[in-house]
């Protein structure tokens, strides 16, 4: 018997998470209504096959979808403060989300006490850190899965295991967006981290303070807090009475904290005074990825009790994820082409630039989502030889970079931008696609943007794939 049995549940939004919630609620005996403003949402056929009794509402709808409803499950893309979700709250209807349903499921299945949950959020680096943390836990012998915002949906993993009659994961490594955290209750992870907080999604939040406060709710519960001491907003999230592990790209002050130190001219990842791994041996490019690696090690120590010394081999073996400062092509004179199409906000692009150890020709621009582009200026001055701008908010980026003494120009599309960037790059330079913007003004998604960039780079004379 489930708390969902017999309840009339409305699922708002039929993306990956919404579809997983709908399928799970139907499996647990709920009466189901699903509403999506799109006429043909992507999961429609799957929903009809897996939940044939579900009532499906597509296109325009109003508050009538709340009639008879006991519980409203929100997809991450649905803002709980406006529209039907706000009306549901006004009527006193409880709101839930995928992470709350996962927590409830683990309790009802009687496995929560044997399960470890590691939760990861941050403006930048959370997908890489999630994948790395899961890989480290697996290397230590645990049945660990990465799920959530990283895909697959956590409830999809749960349903697949149950359908196969397989044991449930010993460790869930969950990437959580701020949108997912908004509807998260009672997850109580064994360890959680906020990697960083910079401008993003300010089209949804009133400002950076509200955005940061939403991220900080990941620490709800009793688990170990893993905090970035180099980010003032994150460092301020420390809660009284909680176990803390701090990390950063600086030298650690405490013996159980993580950081970077210089020894005889070489940088090392360390825990306290103990050297773990030379930065030069880290496969992931950039000091920002060193910080992500330190966060992953701290999560495994704090949440799983695994000593970092056991995990250095797995760190070296981890090859990273596509579209995150990924080397995709190289010219015969040593110019390298890097795809950071996942760099959809200013903080990500600043981190990518600062992670480079050579002059950079930057390709940036797209849908800026209301961000302040001024933090790009210092990083561009430090690292960039030139900047080629594309997309809707190219003029706003140009305005933020005016007077930087770095060459700026516009290109009509990404293919032309790659050609122009290659012309400006000198031997040994990097051409970096790190847009600091979303992609939907010109592309289907960030992966499509990456495909166009990679194809354009590999068409250039004397360029080969990497």
Curated annotation (Swiss-Prot):
Subcellular location: Cytoplasm
Keyword Nucleotide-binding applies: yes
GO terms assigned for molecular function: ATP binding; UDP-N-acetylmuramoylalanine-D-glutamate ligase activity
Catalytic activity field: UDP-N-acetyl-alpha-D-muramoyl-L-alanine + D-glutamate + ATP = UDP-N-acetyl-alpha-D-muramoyl-L-alanyl-D-glutamate + ADP + phosphate + H(+)
EC number from the UniProt entry: 6.3.2.9
Keyword check for Nucleotide-binding: yes
HAMAP family: MurD
Family: Belongs to the MurCDEF family.
NCBIfam families: murD (TIGR01087)
Protein name: UDP-N-acetylmuramoylalanine--D-glutamate ligase
Organism: Aromatoleum aromaticum (strain DSM 19018 / LMG 30748 / EbN1) (Azoarcus sp. (strain EbN1))
Phylogenetic placement of the source organism: Bacteria, Pseudomonadati, Pseudomonadota, Betaproteobacteria, Rhodocyclales
Encoding gene (name): murD
């Amino acid at each position: 018997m489930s708390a969902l049995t017999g309840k009339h549940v409305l699922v708002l939004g039929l993306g990956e998470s919404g579809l997983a919630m709908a399928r799970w609620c139907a499996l647990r005996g709920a009466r189901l209504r699903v509403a999506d403003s799109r006429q043909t949402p992507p999961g429609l056929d799957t929903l009809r096959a897996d939940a044939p009794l579900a009532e499906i509402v597509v296109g325009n709808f109003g508050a009538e979808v709340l009639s008879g409803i006991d519980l409203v499950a929100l997809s991450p893309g649905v803002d709980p403060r406006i529209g039907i979700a706000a009306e549901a709250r006004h009527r006193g209807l409880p709101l839930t989300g995928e992470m709350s349903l996962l927590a409830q499921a683990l309790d009802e299945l009687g496995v929560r006490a044997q399960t470890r949950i590691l939760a990861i959020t941050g403006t930048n680096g959370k997908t890489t850190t999630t994948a790395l943390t899961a890989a480290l836990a697996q290397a230590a012998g645990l049945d660990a899965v990465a799920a959530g915002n990283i895909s697959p949906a956590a409830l999809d993993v749960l349903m697949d295991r149950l359908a196969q009659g397989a044991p449930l994961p010993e460790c869930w490594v969950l990437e959580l967006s701020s949108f997912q955290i908004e509807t998260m209750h009672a997850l109580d992870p064994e360890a959680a981290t906020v990697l960083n907080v910079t401008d993003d999604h300010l089209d949804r939040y009133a400002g950076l303070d509200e955005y940061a406060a939403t991220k900080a709710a990941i620490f709800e519960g009793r688990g170990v807090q893993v905090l970035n001491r180099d980010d003032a907003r994150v460092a301020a999230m420390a809660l009284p009475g909680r176990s803390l592990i701090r990390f950063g790209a600086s030298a650690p002050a405490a013996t159980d904290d993580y950081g970077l130190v210089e020894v005889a001219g070489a940088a090392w990842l360390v825990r306290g005074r103990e050297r773990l791994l030379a930065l030069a041996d880290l496969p992931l490019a950039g000091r920002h990825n060193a910080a992500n690696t330190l966060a992953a090690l701290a999560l495994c120590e704090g949440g799983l009790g695994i000593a970092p010394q056991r995990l250095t081999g797995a760190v070296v073996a981890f090859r990273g994820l596509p579209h995150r400062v990924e080397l995709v092509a190289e010219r015969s004179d040593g110019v390298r082409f890097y795809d950071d199409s996942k760099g959809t906000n200013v903080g990500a692009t600043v981190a990518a630039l600062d992670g480079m150890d050579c002059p950079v020709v930057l390709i940036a621009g797209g849908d800026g989502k209301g961000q302040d582009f001024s933090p790009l200026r210092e990083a561009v001055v430090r690292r960039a030889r030139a900047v080629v701008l594309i997309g809707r908010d190219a003029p706003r980026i140009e305005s933020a970079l005016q007077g930087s003494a770095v060459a700026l120009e516009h290109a009509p599309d990404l293919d032309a931008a790659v050609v122009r960037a290659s012309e400006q790059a000198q031997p040994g330079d990097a051409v970096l696609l790190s847009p600091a913007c979303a992609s939907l003004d010109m592309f289907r998604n960030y992966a499509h943007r990456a495909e166009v960039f990679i194809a354009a780079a590999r068409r250039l004379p004397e360029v080969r794939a990497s």
